[in-house]
Amino acid sequence: MVKEISAQDFVKLDKTKITIVDMREETEYSDSHFEGSINIPVSKFWAGIDNIPKEKAVYVFCNSGYFSEEMVILLEERGYDATNVLGGWKEIKKFII
């Protein structure tokens, strides 16, 4: 079972103690993102997976939460402590605006 967190709880986390993987496309990421997050668009997932450090818990989101759930499964299979942010950016932005 994939670990999940609500967008509301995610925005309350201390971002300096976690790794954030933002799977939105580069243009969306450049418009707004969390400082220190890693942008790995869905289209470049396999090329970017090796850039994710394992030292901290990893929180992953895409635009809606679908692709990030798939990425969390793959990261867990590779030994990461990974969590999917439910609802993705569409939900997150409700709590940061």
Positions of PLM-derived features:
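Rhodanese-like catalytic fold shared by cysteine-dependent sulfurtransferases
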Residues: 1-19, 26-57, 66-97
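Short, surface-exposed ligand- or partner-binding patches at beta-edge/loop junctions that are enriched
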Residues: 61-62
